[in-house]
């Protein structure tokens, strides 16, 4: 079963971002709480990488981040949803949202983690095939860099497509995981130009977060979380009662 979607304009992602910023300013306590959670997780990853002195811990750390990220985002979606309904958004109510339809959400989080682990295995395989000669010319590495980049882009596109609207859909309409995944994939496929812009905005926010040693997450993740809720509401067709 796939829930139908609307067609959105190329500039829509910037509108969602402005709505997310508006919610961020209007709900300082909730924004600060979830921002601190995201920031703590990001700082933990940065410190772990520095302490281990190796990039090998980056991907496992990101798998953990992929597992906890959707659950933290649920609280932000709930807060935006409450404001949309004209209710007072409270931190306690947003935290309760994390337990709503939890079996589907856990299944989805595990699926995301499996995708990340698969990605790690592909990356490790490509790395093992790299020329081992020190000082080998760049042309020897070029095919592996191109293949690695293409595989990474395809996997990133798939993960983004199945996850763009799945979590808010499971929270609001309590649908099963497969309905949410197919609906999200269909919505992204039907709005490719706008979704490329939205994916770039999200990547930019996460990069700013990590580039500032996790501190930027305090601001970027709540704004992106609220923005995702507005993106979901504008893209997925509403229920007709």
What is the predicted function of each stretch?
Residues 1-241:
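Hydrophobic alpha-helical membrane segments
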């Amino acid at each position: 079963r796939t829930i139908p979607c609307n067609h959105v304009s190329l500039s829509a992602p910037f509108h969602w971002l402005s709505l997310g910023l508006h919610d961020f300013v209007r709900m300082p306590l909730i924004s600060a709480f979830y921002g601190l959670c995201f920031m703590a997780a990001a700082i933990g990853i940065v410190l772990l990488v520095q302490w281990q002195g190796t990039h090998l811990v980056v991907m496992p750390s990101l798998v953990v981040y992929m597992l906890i990220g959707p659950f933290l985002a649920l609280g932000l979606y709930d807060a935006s949803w409450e404001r949309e309904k004209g209710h007072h958004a409270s931190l306690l109510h947003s935290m309760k949202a994390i337990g709503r339809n939890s079996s589907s959400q856990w299944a989805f989080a595990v699926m995301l983690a499996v995708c990340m682990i698969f990605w790690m295995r592909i990356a490790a395989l490509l790395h093992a095939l790299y020329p081992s000669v020190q000082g080998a010319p760049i042309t020897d590495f070029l095919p592996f860099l191109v293949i690695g980049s293409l595989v990474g882009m395809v996997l990133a596109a798939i993960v983004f497509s199945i996850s763009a609207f799945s979590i808010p859909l499971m929270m609001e309409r309590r649908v099963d995981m497969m309905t949410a995944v197919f609906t999200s994939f269909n919505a992204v496929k039907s709005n490719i130009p706008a979704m490329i812009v939205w994916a770039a905005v999200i990547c930019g926010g996460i990069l700013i977060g990590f580039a500032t040693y996790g501190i930027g997450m305090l601001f970027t993740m709540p704004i992106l979380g609220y923005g995702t809720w507005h993106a979901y509401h504008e893209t997925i067709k509403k229920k007709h009662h």
